[in-house]
Amino acid sequence: MSTPEMEDFSRIKRLPPYVFNIVNDLKAAARARGEDIIDFGMGNPDQPTPQHIVDKLVEAAQRKDTHRYSMSRGIPRLRRAICRWYKDRYDVELDPESQAIVTIGSKEGLAHLSLACLGPGDSVLVPNPAYPIHPYGFVIAGADIRHVPLVPGVDFFDKLQEAIVDSWPKPKMLVLNFPGNPTGQCVELDFFEKVIEIARENNIWVVHDLAYADIAFDGYVAPSILQVKGAEDIAVEFFSLSKSYNMPGWRVGFMCGNKVLVAALARMKSYLDYGMFTPIQVAAIQALEGPQDCVREIRDMYQRRRDVLCDGLNAAGWPVERPKATMFVWAKIPEQYLEMGSLEFSKKLLKDAKVAVSPGVGFGQHGDDYVRFGLIENEHRTRQAVRGIKEMIRRDAKQSEA
């Protein structure tokens, strides 16, 4: 009798190998050899959580009444704070009882929303390239993915319209993420107005991930899809405190908008979790309602890192564009290396420049001409990385001439 394998599990069989693990394993091996690897691979903020938020966590944790099971939807005070945040920031009125739910990070919320709403035979539209949970959260639920190209020189909305018309069965849901990971792509409010119009015409739910709303540069202001009139009839929006407040390990997010989708996620979560630790939720209230200087300081830090990296790569002979938002630089592979593809080029950067990046193919087939830099190294280390890359390019050019 043969031993059962993980591949025997139907949901696991639908998930491809995780491309990023290949680079992660090589990175770990290099470090084990004593090599100094400058790591731009994961979008994992490197700075501590602002002290006033940590202090509130400690204060709440020292209370005797905060250590019991919490509420899977989030404590009422946090849901009210979330709705005030939307009102103050976007002038959007939300009901904390029916239009807001706390999630254990955006990934948990997206995955459980997909399980609540979709199943085999359902179709979902997702940009490509995309943050992996956006397609694969729905793949896990058994849904089928229709990829919509999000690439330079192609009108994404036109492609979205084509996908809606050409798909059968008709898509049940559309997932968006602007400002986008990994591409840094940004939109204005009129884009969301067109999305809501076409979604309503075709009875398609819209899920928008607004994780990088605060990490916006050069005066750009990221809109919320809920600012569109009538959006609440058909859309929800996720937000995470991970990037705005340097709280990635805390796992605090929320979803707001359409009452039907909020209720569906709440029902699913009622079977799966008791919500996050109450002191974390109390600290999240402090984050949203306390001083916001920290958010601006975090944004400015990423902007400085963006400028150092992009200016350095351009000077080194690797043409890249400065993104208007996010903590990522989506860099097209230099022409002389383009045929390698993103995975092999990422391996080369690790071996020859001691720099770790994420291969673009890990975000979808339309990302294979790119690599993603996460702005998680300080300016000094970023300059060091640029020097290593410049030397690699110079050395390779010299060898090709020989």
At which residue positions do the language-model features occur?
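A glycine-/small-polar-enriched, mobile loop at the entrance of the PLP active site in fold-type I
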Residues: G41-N44, E59-R79, D88-R89
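PLP-dependent class I/II
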Residues: M1-D8, K13-Y18, D25, A29-I38, ...
